Amino acid sequence: MASSMLSSAAVVTSPAQATMVAPFTGLKSSAAFPVTRKANNDITSIASNGGRVSCMKVWPPVGKKKFETLSYLPDLTEVELGKEVDYLLRNKWIPCVEFELEHGFVYREHGSTPGYYDGRYWTMWKLPLFGCTDSAQVLKEVQECKTEYPNAFIRIIGFDNNRQVQCISFIAYKPPSFTGA
């Protein structure tokens, strides 16, 4: 009796087995993987601008303080700052202006390990510019901060309120008294 029940159950499950996916059979052959080529150290093969390679000299690596994003470039003009803020706004990030009166760069005064008091946290200028749609509004706030604190470092940061992270940060103004050393 038990054998007849077992065979009828096997008959019922056989149509379901016909629709199952084939089992995993292992990795594909190595013929499907690309063959590695000999490394070509010729710099002209890397650039594809018609054979003309134009390299831009970057900021000197020794004796210059590094700040935020783009710190290896010369100071940004008002037009370039506006373009960076437009990029920030296009990505739906919330702009915020911050300033620092003493040290506009990371420094370690109270130890050799990174910590809270090593120059990463600046004072916020007003509130973040929620709902801002124009880079001129942000640059106006930078100008007001410059007027109020002419000897301060000023940076613009962008927050992504969905991911709850700071996505961009760059220096908008360095005080005239700063020598860069």
Swiss-Prot record:
Coiled-coil stretches: none
Task: List keywords of the entry alphabetically.
Answer: Calvin cycle, Carbon dioxide fixation, Chloroplast, Photorespiration, Photosynthesis, Plastid, Transit peptide
| Example of a GO cellular component annotation carried by this entry | chloroplast
> Where is this gene product found?
Plastid, Chloroplast
Bilayer-crossing residues are none
Subcellular location, principal: plastid
From which domain of life does this come? Eukaryota
Q: Which SUPFAM superfamilies match?
A: RuBisCO, small subunit
Per the record, the GO terms for biological process are:
photorespiration; reductive pentose-phosphate cycle
Molecular function (GO) terms for this protein are: ribulose-bisphosphate carboxylase activity
Q: Which Gene3D superfamilies match?
A: Ribulose bisphosphate carboxylase, small subunit
Instruction: Provide the transit peptide span.
Output: 1-54
Similarity-based family: Belongs to the RuBisCO small chain family.
Function per UniProt: RuBisCO catalyzes two reactions: the carboxylation of D-ribulose 1,5-bisphosphate, the primary event in carbon dioxide fixation, as well as the oxidative fragmentation of the pentose substrate. Both reactions occur simultaneously and in competition at the same active site. Although the small subunit is not catalytic it is essential for maximal activity.
Q: What is its quaternary makeup?
A: Heterohexadecamer of 8 large and 8 small subunits.
Miscellaneous information on this protein: The basic functional RuBisCO is composed of a large chain homodimer in a 'head-to-tail' conformation. In form I RuBisCO this homodimer is arranged in a barrel-like tetramer with the small subunits forming a tetrameric 'cap' on each end of the 'barrel'.
Q: What protein is this chain from? A: Ribulose bisphosphate carboxylase small subunit, chloroplastic 2
Species name? Brassica napus
